[in-house]
C-alpha cells in the first residue's frame, strides 16, 4: 500500500500492495 511513507523496503513492497506486516522489518 503506497500510502505508507516510502523507505527502502516499502518503496518496493509498498507499491506492490503486498502484505507489508513483515516487509517493514529490516
Curated annotation (Swiss-Prot):
Keyword Methyltransferase: no
Keywords for the protein's UniProt record, in alphabetical order: Ion channel impairing toxin, Neurotoxin, Secreted, Toxin, Voltage-gated sodium channel impairing toxin
Localization terms from the record: Secreted
Keyword Transferase: no
Protein origin, superkingdom: Eukaryota
Main subcellular location of this protein, as a coarse class: secreted
An example Gene Ontology CC term for this record: extracellular region
Tissue expression summary: Expressed by the venom gland.
MF (Gene Ontology): sodium channel regulator activity; toxin activity
Function: Binds to sodium channels (Nav) and affects the channel activation process.
Complexes and interactors: Toxin b is a heterodimer composed of toxin alpha and toxin beta.
Protein name: Toxin b subunit alpha
Amino acid at each position: 500500500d503506497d500510502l505508507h511513507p516510502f523507505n527502502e523496503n516499502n518503496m518496493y513492497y509498498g507499491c506492490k500492495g503486498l502484505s507489508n506486516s513483515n516487509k517493514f522489518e529490516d
